Amino acid sequence: MGVANDSSPEYQWMSPHLNYFKNFNKETLLKIEENDYINSSFFQQKDKRFYPINDDFYHISTGGYGIVFKIDNYVVKFVLEAIKLYSPMEIMAELTVPKFLYNNLKGDEKKLIVCVWAMGLNYKLTFLHTLYKRVLHMLLLLIQTMDGQELSLRYSSKVFLKAFNERKDSIKFVKLLSHFYPAVINSNINVINYFNRMFHFFEHEKGTNYEYERGNIIIFPLTLYSADKVDTELAIKLGFKSLVQYIKFIFLQMALLYIKIYELPCCDNFLHADLKPDNILLFDSNEPIIIHLDKKFVFNERIKSALNDFDFSQVAGIINKKIKNNFKVEHNWYYDFHFFVHTLLKTYPEIEKDIEFSTALEEFIMCTKTDCDKYRLKVSILHPISFLEKFIMRDIFSDWINGGN
């Protein structure tokens, strides 16, 4: 079950949070709950009651190497790096690869890439872990006070997450956060949203022995959604006839992007290495996107999809040390699309309703347990890019071939 380490008698005694919460009990919390004041930015962002009332950094995601916030029209990603393994210049793929592709692609396909606006290298990022611990302790002590329990910084991961998830959508709990977050945390970085993801990152994914010392800061444009967030209702709202048509749309745009990249000189080694729906972002599209192969593909939709998160990517002479040693065999575009199709089928079981499309995707990956582990190819299957080009010429994608004519 796992119990935290912040439980030594010395730490418990000196904790300012512990001493602060000794001034409160269930009755005083009830009085706070009865007040009218509520800061709507402490609702979860998926909650319709959420509203960013301050110019704060709002936590929107944590996973892998990145802790992501949004502020105004920007997305700011803090990437904790193993600086001892790589020099700062060896961990710039997220900047250099998309910029290289954008500068070399000549047609509308370049609109399907997310380029970093700015990147700062080798910053001290210890404040993120410190902030996380402060917020965790505040939540622990607040929940204990609500339940009339003895105050302690010892906790079980399972018990804490259950208690937090049960309360996070409650208006009474949000009223308490509206009072205690400014008083105890006093920061313009709001990590209450998706706090369970940050908890998993620091407590499990990176482990207690991980060094949270240094890393990079990356600034992106703010997106409408990541592709995995679109459900049937939103797909219709975005102008698609169905969720499956939307899935075909993002698959086709990514396929066209890859085909055009592989047409570039010396770029037939391009790998993204993490092609999946949550690494595809959706932006407004104010004009048609037209991409020419043997046939013309025309997209008149009011959104476009764009590939993001090139942290593990490589292309041409830009070799990524993060993935170089992980691949035991040679791979090309098919490695990415094999993983992509698996994740599409997992994310969207609705694909099964379209027999022609689902059958085509199943035939596309055609793998066994000896070939594939957790959707990742273990063997070298180097289909030429013409394999992908033939696939997208099928009637499945007739809505966009020659403008749907």
From Swiss-Prot:
Boundaries of every Protein kinase domain copy: 54-405
GO cellular component terms, A-Z: host cell endoplasmic reticulum; host cell endoplasmic reticulum-Golgi intermediate compartment
One Pfam family named in its UniProt record: Pox_ser-thr_kin
Record note on modification: Phosphorylated in vivo. Autophosphorylated in vitro.
Reaction equation(s) it catalyzes: L-seryl-[protein] + ATP = O-phospho-L-seryl-[protein] + ADP + H(+); L-threonyl-[protein] + ATP = O-phospho-L-threonyl-[protein] + ADP + H(+)
Example of a GO MF term: protein serine kinase activity
Active site, UniProt feature: D274
Domain of life: Viruses
Residue sites binding ATP per the record: I60, S61, T62, G63, G64, Y65, G66, I67, V68, K84
Keywords assigned: ATP-binding, Host endoplasmic reticulum, Kinase, Late protein, Nucleotide-binding, Phosphoprotein, Serine/threonine-protein kinase, Transferase
InterPro entries referenced in this protein's UniProt entry, alphabetically: Poxvirus_ser/thr_kinase, Prot_kinase_dom, Ser/Thr_kinase_AS
Subcellular location: Host endoplasmic reticulum; Host endoplasmic reticulum-Golgi intermediate compartment
EC number: 2.7.11.1
Functional description taken from the UniProt entry: Essential serine-protein kinase involved in the early stage of virion morphogenesis.
UniProt similarity note: Belongs to the protein kinase superfamily. Ser/Thr protein kinase family. Poxviruses subfamily.
UniProt name for this protein: Serine/threonine-protein kinase 2
Organism field: Vaccinia virus (strain L-IVP) (VACV)
Name of the gene encoding the protein in the UniProt record: OPG054
